[in-house]
Amino acid sequence: GLLEADDPAALSLDLEQLRADLKADPYFKNVPSFQPERGKTAVAFHAKDDLPEVRREVFKLLLRHAVKFYAEVRDMRAVLSYVRERNGRNGTYRYHPNELYDSSVARLFKNRLHQYESCRVCYAVRGSSDRTKSFADSLVLARDRFAKQWDKQVTTAIEVTAAQPVQQAGLQAVDYMLWALQRHYARQESRFLEMVWDKVSLIHAVDETDKAPYGVYYSKTKPLVGAALKNKVGI
């Protein structure tokens, strides 16, 4: 997922202020996730760990900011089918999760980068290895694919940095948007996504290929909530 913020500094300040206000609220005094040693809400917002009362406040805050959310949704059964097909053609092929991650990053940014002279991207650290170069390579691939498809010269300068969510509040914000999307698919619980749908620009369901080989694009004019939700779809 990608969250584009007009003023990331203001978003970070507001999230930090909200967290400080909640920590100072006696209502949360003895809540485990608010204890600093737990490394959860007391340190950074994380939708999976935060209380429902906290989630609602974070979502309300996001609605006040000029942000746009984009996401690529993959059906893991389709990914498994692809892996088996690759293994059938090449017995030495071994799937690695980074392969799916990198290809999703390239898809996600393909139609975004050309809109700007320069682009600063901060991504969340995953695991212990430094994947900044791999992430940057995926962005360059996305930029080049767009240029080739539309026969245009794209010279967008790309700056990539890695951070932990505790270091970059914008990563906490995109985590909330992804959590809302995941709840829709995994639990058919759509109220969170409906609440923030005004901030959603595009959701690409890559493997919903019944009507088109490239999948389905959901947007404000084609809402995801209310669309037929297949049991096989997952993220």
Model-derived regions: residue spans:
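Phosphate-ester processing/binding pockets and catalytic centers
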Residues: G1-I235
